[in-house]
Amino acid sequence: QIIGDIPIYVAMDSADAWAHPELFQLDQDNVPLAVAGCPPDGFSATGQLWGNPLYRWDYHRNTGYQWWISRMSYCFRLYDVVRIDHFRGFDEYFSIPYGDKDARGGHWEKGPGIDLFRKIEQALGWKQVIAEDLGYMTDSVRHLVYESGFPGMKVLEFAFDSRDSGCASDYLPHNYPENCVAYTGTHDNETIVGWWKSITAAERKLARDYLCDHARSEER
């Protein structure tokens, strides 16, 4: 099977934003009112300013999500499985005023939630979707992933952080739920070789101890 990847957002200079400005939060001159990104966190003190135009979810809802249905339908003509990047944005999305230099002035807005995916399923039938649910997660995001029935993601490279205690990491294989897809890494990660060379000696020991212990358990 072929797994295709689509982002939640499109670019400001995309054909979609040009042909259908009514789908996005734009002013009368088609200038964004706000843009997408992520809030400040432990990795970036100023957050992430992506700059994509945000959706007018009220308009999408009133049109029965036809644009999204068309988008997903086309993707399934190309792929057997579709992974949706930044799935948490369907629960809540981060809105940053247009013109800001970083993401510190942004705030969370409510997304369409499960309603979007119910409408897609009604139109297209059940389809295989992977929900990219990495990063900042809340109970409401986890509930949306659960309610959708889509498998979430687990990334092995995240499992051996020396700051985590014991075997508590959600990314350790023995903690995986049944409904998930496991990756060694994603497009945002190092290759396995690059990752192995970049981690600390303590983290390499964690990985060796864990993987060797589980290999011995399998042999028994």
Task: Report the location of each language-model feature.
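Ligand-binding beta-strand-loop-alpha-helix segment within the catalytic cores
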Residues: 5
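Alpha-amylase-like alpha-glycosidases and glucanotransferases acting on alpha-linked glucans and related
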Residues: 1, 9-218
